[in-house]
Amino acid sequence: MNPIAVTLLTGFLGAGKTTLLRHILNEQHGYKIAVIENEFGEVSVDDQLIGDRATQIKTLTNGCICCSRSNELEDALLDLLDNLDKGNIQFDRLVIECTGMADPGPIIQTFFSHEVLCQRYLLDGVIALVDAVHADEQMNQFTIAQSQVGYADRILLTKTDVAGEAEKLHERLARINARAPVYTVTHGDIDLGLLFNTNGFMLEENVVSTKPRFHFIADKQNDISSIVVELDYPVDISEVSRVMENLLLESADKLLRYKGMLWIDGEPNRLLFQGVQRLYSADWDRPWGDEKPHSTMVFIGIQLPEEEIRAAFAGLRK
């Protein structure tokens, strides 16, 4: 049985999550999508209470399913599985909408800390919506607005038709999250192919989509930022493990996400790793082949000690 792919939708208040959800729920896209949201919009549905956890599940005319959280996200996720297994509903994808002030971190960790959820669901990616009109003000006032961007695998920039030129905002987003490509979305209308199959939590070689180049001096220092570390020499696996363990010991509470591809001394294959806060995984990938070996890592977090991190990895040179 293949696990159900999960997309997490985050973004600050007014960023356009509801508009995007309306697009997902009303389009005849052929996907069998279940959506967990906090409040239901004005949609024509057949209501029914299913399950002993009082999770409200609604089946829409295009085959999508709406599910309101009761008390705990775990309950809603398990209720959906119960009803899927009983044949009451059908879905092969799940989209979860976070509230505007929610920290995506605990929601992400739900899929790695519950045995049944780990087996039955596969966290595919985090999509962050950013309001181009109000984003700077929101990120200046609320670290959570930066955090939502920091966790993202894709960033959707909304209201650009009103905001106008957004190059400086693009740069600020890249300073926060060097991993995530930015797409413009108008009134929630976007190719769902850009939202799905991001493989954000899979071990893969695309550590950074495009290394950002900055043309503007930042008006305000972000609390959350990306650190991209590149090494052109091999590293000893025990030594790089020690550096990573020290980093997690000292900064796990500050780390949001991190990902990397390592050139390990004496090994023909690349080593890939990815993590969220304290949870991480690593595995061997394909051989380097004709590609010039190198290491690339990106760390996204809250006021990370950049000089110390760079010095620790620089100390691995033999």
UniProtKB/Swiss-Prot annotation:
It catalyses: GTP + H2O = GDP + phosphate + H(+). A motif (CXCC motif) lies at residues 64-67. Signal peptide: none annotated. One of its GO terms (biological process) is DNA damage response. InterPro entries: CobW-likC_sf, CobW-like_C, CobW/HypB/UreG_nucleotide-bd, P-loop_NTPase, Zinc-reg_GTPase_activator. Zn(2+) 3 binds at residues 167, 170, 187. Residues 224-315 form the CobW C-terminal domain. Zn(2+) 1 binds at residues 37, 42, 66. Its EC number is 3.6.5.-. Zn(2+) 4 binds at residues 167, 170, 187. GO terms for cellular component: cytoplasm; cytosol. The keyword Cell wall biogenesis/degradation does not apply. GTP binds at residues 11-19, 161. One of its GO terms (molecular function) is identical protein binding. Zn(2+) 2 binds at residues 74, 114. The keyword Metal-binding applies. Keywords: Chaperone, GTP-binding, Hydrolase, Metal-binding, Nucleotide-binding, Zinc. Zinc chaperone that directly transfers zinc cofactor to target proteins, thereby activating them. Zinc is transferred from the CXCC motif in the GTPase domain to the zinc binding site in target proteins in a process requiring GTP hydrolysis. Belongs to the SIMIBI class G3E GTPase family. ZNG1 subfamily. Monomer in the apo form. Metal binding induces oligomerization. Forms homodimers and higher oligomers. This is Zinc chaperone YjiA.
